Amino acid sequence: WDIEVPGYKVNNKEWLKSQVSRAFLPKYFPNYEKYLWIDCDAWVNDWNSVELYFKACDNGKLGITQTIGPGYKITSKVNWLIGKLAVIKSQNFKHAVKSKIGYAKARKLAFAPHINIGVFSLEKNSKAWSLWQKNLAIALKAGNIFGSEGLAINMSVYIDDLETEFLPLNCNWITSNLLPKFDEQKEIFVEPYLPNYKIGIMHLAAGIWKDGKDMRINKEIKIEIETLDNKKILKSLRYIN
């Protein structure tokens, strides 16, 4: 483990090491100038997004995408109690409270647009690595292993003001948040709203579920999506080779 965690948190789930080691990529792959991480449930639909990520991390910046954009009807979950009283249920706030980083910091994260760590780019010598590692160590003291690396990067950006190049939503298109459309003429997935830019990286985070089955695991699953000609077709959102 790059950061020691109690055995009871691991509970024989050795794969959780990957949740920590992601913040130490240059240690494991030292001979590269730039690093682009793409989760295993994501795939490249348009190569231009890859070039954008490599450009985004110039001069030590973090290249990453916020999970907010046209068509998002809700950005944070809130349970309203009575009048103005409410319980904040945003992903950042929930993880921050669980990790006991302090309410002052948790409040700064509460309504900040969540940053998904499934796709990002960094230069080898960026100070972002050490900042991320520092915040990850803090988050792991009380929080769960799974999700701590995401909380740590949100802390680095929104609390420590890590210099960040925010890329368009289509550079990390989370399908469970908003389904794409399909351009049948060009045979490519596109954004559902004008001007219907190409999806850069399709990310099946949280899964696409049908009849209790997850498309990430079951290659046979297809769902109904719209085309640019307003037709409805059955389509898999997986990479098809």
Model-derived segments and spans:
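Glycosyltransferase catalytic domains, chiefly GT-A lineage
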Residues: W1-N241
